[in-house]
Amino acid sequence: MVTQPIPEFQGRIGRTLEESEPYFPAKQHPGGEAPNVVIILMDDTGFAQLGCYGSDIDTSHIDALANNGLRFTNFHVTPLCSPTRAALLTGRSQHSVGMRSVSNHQTGFPHQLGHITNHAATVAEVLQSEGYATFCAGKWHLAPTNDISAAGPFDQWPLARGFDRFYGFLEGETDQFHPELVVDNQHIDAPAKMEGSYHLSEDLVDQLLKMINDSKGIRPDRPFFAYLPFGATHAPHQAPDEYLRK
């Protein structure tokens, strides 16, 4: 985690109000040239399934992102959800941050805590401390199973690990048509939509865009970090009919 030092008071306290001078610390801002950062994570998806890496599967939108963004082709992934997320968000080996396996398991040993160790900072915590707005919409799977009920504790939920806002689900999987959802630190009911008109992937994108628009509408100069970890390519495999017909 990133701990913020308490700003030293630089005003003056006199015997009267006239003799005193208030002090308001400046808000942290990364500067005008700081870029917006968007990370999209697809669950249980191999690189050979993407058109930009030679697949025959139509992934035109993903291909456009790859062609117009950055490709990081030397990242170590595991065939498990939580370890890859822990490594991606910390930039460190999953073993060194307490996540050798999925967060469902806690062994009582430092390499498998069921969450990212508090001695490691996430990229969201680092950017948040530098003045970024930070948003997460999607699958978390970085908190112990026993700690994700409505009663908490909330110390390993997204808002405690560097994100200003969260919309998504905390476990490893959820029904894509009738998901179990959390907003910030509160469990909510799934949106009431007509059968066949709702899919979680679209909802996640819509909610993330709302977060960004809300932030930019009030502080347009503030850059954002958006983390969008989809859950659709993980079990249960539930695609909209238009994709099943292909």
Q: What kind of feature is each model-predicted range?
A:
Residues 1-246:
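Formylglycine-dependent sulfatase
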